[in-house]
Amino acid sequence: MAGSVNKVILVGNLGADPEIRRLNSGEPVVNIRIATSESWRDKNSGERKEKTEWHNVVIFNEGIAKVAEQYLKKGMKVYVEGQLQTRKWQDQTGADKYTTEVVLQRFRGELQMLDGRQGEGGQVGGYSGGGSSRGSDFGQSGPNESFNRGGGAPRGGGGGGSSRELDDEIPF
């Protein structure tokens, strides 16, 4: 096999406000829990069923951590892109435990807030961690733009925009 891919994309709702802590170096680390749900109709009873999965997300990317700390609140709908990582730890009795988390590393990952701000519809925006071509200027553009400074059109389509906001120009 030539290579492998470890990429996770989640769209869900925050189960609580972000938990922020600091490393000894002063860098922020943010923990969030995201709920994703799927629903279906039971073939036998015709009853609607729903299953919710809870995902632990850890943000090491300083720019994304600042955005999470300032703007994320319980119940908000978010888009998160990161890597799956499993870590081993020991509980108080010395038994080995394992935790699997979605991790946004220092120079990788993406966070977008999908709920409107103060009654606005559509996508609020987000932040992509990455190389030097991506800035840490969250909040300096309009409500329907996400931060993907690598070039091209903004990511995400948003919703609730009017037809006059649409750009008819082809992005390539």
Curated annotation (Swiss-Prot):
Protein's UniProt keywords contain Ribonucleoprotein: no
GO biological-process terms attached to the record: DNA recombination; DNA repair; DNA replication
Pfam families: SSB (PF00436)
Keywords on record: DNA damage, DNA recombination, DNA repair, DNA replication, DNA-binding
Source superkingdom: Bacteria
Annotated motif Important for interaction with partner proteins, positions: 167-172
Annotated ranges, domain SSB: 5-111
Annotated region described as Disordered, given as residue ranges: 114-172
GO cellular component: nucleoid
Biased composition (Gly residues): 119-133, 149-162
SUPFAM superfamilies assigned: Nucleic acid-binding proteins
GO MF assignments: single-stranded DNA binding
PANTHER family, alphabetized: SINGLE-STRANDED DNA-BINDING PROTEIN
Record text on subunit structure and interactions: Homotetramer.
Role according to the record: Plays an important role in DNA replication, recombination and repair. Binds to ssDNA and to an array of partner proteins to recruit them to their sites of action during DNA metabolism.
The protein, known as: Single-stranded DNA-binding protein
Lineage: Bacteria, Pseudomonadati, Pseudomonadota, Alphaproteobacteria, Hyphomicrobiales
Gene field: ssb
